[in-house]
Amino acid sequence: SLFSFALNAKDYRPGIDYQFLDEEVQTRNPEKIEVIEFFWLGCGHCFTLEGLIRDWKKNLNKDIDFWRVPVTWNPPAKEHAKLFYAAEALGMEEIIGSAFTSIHLDRKFLTSEREITELFSAFGVEPDKYQAISNSFRIKSNINAADVYGRKYEIMGVPAFIVNGKYKVKASRDIPTEKLLDVVDHLVDIERSQ
């Protein structure tokens, strides 16, 4: 109802709970509402959010184009981006959850080729196959694109979300990690109503 939308709109304040991007960025599919998550496997807040993201994705409307971009700020982040894109290329999203668990609960930081190859081997991926995929042109292109996206959206911390090329949402004093998806949903509702 209009009343509940008005109440909801008061809960999340522009400039405090989310920011407008300086310039609107064209989305990859103008027919849908785009939501991009920027993350790093080594980020504790991203790990906290991972289970929530998994549940959130199960209930996404067909008008949402959700995709993820790993940050590539430093050598460990680049290795994790390679791991993410290799798992995605293999259609093995469960490796991402396992990587988060390895890093944050098992204290295996997955920054060496050997550690990452062992992780993929645990899922039945032969070391040679992982090497071929992770060093492929496709993966290198994805990592370069991730770097470009991170710069374009001025991602300085993760987790962060970009909603429909207009808004940036990130954890803050006012918005804890667990509430990020609520703010994203609020912005999606705004976009849907326009």
Over which residues does each language-model region extend?
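Extracytoplasmic thiol/disulfide redox context detector
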Residues: 1-75, 151-152, 186-194
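Sec/Tat-exported extracytoplasmic proteins
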Residues: 39-42, 57-60, 87-91, 103-107, ...
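Solvent-exposed loop/turn segments at secondary-structure junctions
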Residues: 41-45, 72-76, 102-106, 138-139, ...
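Extracytoplasmic/secreted envelope proteins and their assembly/folding machinery
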Residues: 50-57, 80-84, 96, 113, ...
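Structural microenvironment flanking redox-active thiols in thiol-disulfide oxidoreductases
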Residues: 61-89, 96-121
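C-terminal cap of thioredoxin/glutaredoxin-like
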Residues: 122-194
